[in-house]
Amino acid sequence: MEQTWRWYGPNDLVSLADVRQAGATGVVTALHHIPNGEVWSVEEILKRKAIVEDAGLVWSVVESVPIHEDIKTHTGNYEQWIANYQQTLRNLAQCGIRTVCYNFMPVLDWTRTDLEYVLPDGSKALRFDQIEFAAFEMHILKRPGAEADYTEEEIAQAAERFATMSDEDKARLTRNIIAGLPGAEEGYTLDQFRKHLELYKDIDKAKLRENFAVFLKAIIPVAEEVGVRMAVHPDDPPRPILGLPRIVSTIEDMQWMVDTVNSMANGFTMCTGSYGVRADNDLVDMIKQFGPRIYFTHLRSTMREDNPKTFHEAAHLNGDVDMYEVVKAIVEEEHRRKAEGKEDLIPMRPDHGHQMLDDLKKKTNPGYSAIGRLKGLAEVRGVELAIQRAFFSR
């Protein structure tokens, strides 16, 4: 696997020198300063590429070229936003950058309720608490009909939890959910958030798939033409939330994408920390079935708790993800490609890491502190080395 590291650009608290010392050779980045929907110019792409290469690294993957909400709702200037997206792909290809990670999650990107969940060893992790999320949705956001998405027990627990929250607890929970986590392309006030949810009141799973199909049928032929590989990132968490449909959550969703636009440019990001939240997702089977279309991997683990919809981000080699079998399946896919004469490695990043050691004293981006990711990258690197030596050294 190609070892990569997500970098948020010149304002990132982790420097490119740090990235190189961590052992990564590739950088995963995006032009976050360009507004959603606008074209990424060749000039801006080359400027970022030069910064990365001057540090002795390569720009391996774009994560992400964001998709404007008008495209997801099929309203407003969606045709112009699609045309802009097509041009951005052409410009990236012209600059030699050919792997693009993206997602089709409506309104919210990845979502957590607690950004400082303290683990037994004193390090901090990200957590999604189903009961806290229910308390937010029913008692702070007050979304009409939200009760239908929860069990009677969850509704009672959420009311009890809300009753114990201080004003600061409520404000922190609201910020964590709607203000935008690292990599998220939108942040909202509570009123803005309600208005954006309202835009989806008539959009169910079938309609969102229909809108996604319009996007894929416009984008994938351009990607194929210019040699770009699109790698969709799964929903996080991989299930409907806030009354919003989610359509990249299961192996059935992956198959729907392939059936909708059967092109090798139409591929996947295997994010084990997202897909792995669902106990019914067999990650190794997903890799084996769709291996030729996996162009990027995020390798981390999560741990489901007593409520199976509550989870926290576990250490990379612990939790519910069998990292050994996952890495073995990815390495096997790389060797299958090699046998076909393809030498390209699959870019891998350790995704998130625990806030630990000296980083506990520093300001860090949630999930993106340096030392926790350094640890995760080293652990996954070790697993891969052992697999390569044990099975492919001859």
Swiss-Prot record:
<keyword id="KW-0408">Iron</keyword>
<keyword id="KW-0464">Manganese</keyword>
<dbReference type="InterPro" id="IPR004628">
    <property type="entry name" value="Man_deHydtase"/>
</dbReference>
<comment type="pathway">
    <text>Carbohydrate metabolism; pentose and glucuronate interconversion.</text>
</comment>
<dbReference type="GO" id="GO:0042840">
    <property type="term" value="P:D-glucuronate catabolic process"/>
</dbReference>
<dbReference type="GO" id="GO:0008927">
    <property type="term" value="F:mannonate dehydratase activity"/>
</dbReference>
<dbReference type="Pfam" id="PF03786">
    <property type="entry name" value="UxuA"/>
</dbReference>
<protein>
    <recommendedName>
        <fullName>Mannonate dehydratase</fullName>
        <ecNumber>4.2.1.8</ecNumber>
    </recommendedName>
</protein>
<keyword id="KW-0456">Lyase</keyword>
<dbReference type="GO" id="GO:0030145">
    <property type="term" value="F:manganese ion binding"/>
</dbReference>
<dbReference type="GO" id="GO:0008198">
    <property type="term" value="F:ferrous iron binding"/>
</dbReference>
<comment type="similarity">
    <text>Belongs to the mannonate dehydratase family.</text>
</comment>
<comment type="function">
    <text>Catalyzes the dehydration of D-mannonate.</text>
</comment>
<dbReference type="InterPro" id="IPR036237">
    <property type="entry name" value="Xyl_isomerase-like_sf"/>
</dbReference>
